[in-house]
């Protein structure tokens, strides 16, 4: 997960709405089933999906009243903690 990507997609959600991100997730998940994709291509799609799902989680925290910066930091701490386990 990359914080700059999450931050950028949050800006997109603010300017548009999160439905675009949800539809992009659906498209990428569908495309990941293409049998002829190379491993590297699947890895890139997986990384994009991780960042998009992460952005939706951060956006949910913001909608619940958390400050944007605090929401991003909380999310990244949770992700980092999960990786360390």
PLM features: what roles do these ranges have?
Residues 1-85:
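C-terminal alpha-helical interaction appendages
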């Amino acid at each position: 997960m990359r914080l700059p990507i999450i931050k950028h997609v949050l800006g997109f959600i603010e300017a548009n709405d999160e439905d675009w991100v949800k539809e992009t997730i659906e498209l990428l998940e569908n495309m990941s089933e293409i049998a002829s994709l190379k491993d590297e291509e699947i890895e890139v799609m997986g990384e994009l999906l991780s960042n998009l799902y992460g952005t939706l989680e951060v956006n949910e925290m913001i909608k619940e009243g958390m400050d944007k910066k605090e929401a991003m930091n909380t999310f990244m701490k949770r992700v980092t903690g999960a990786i360390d386990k």
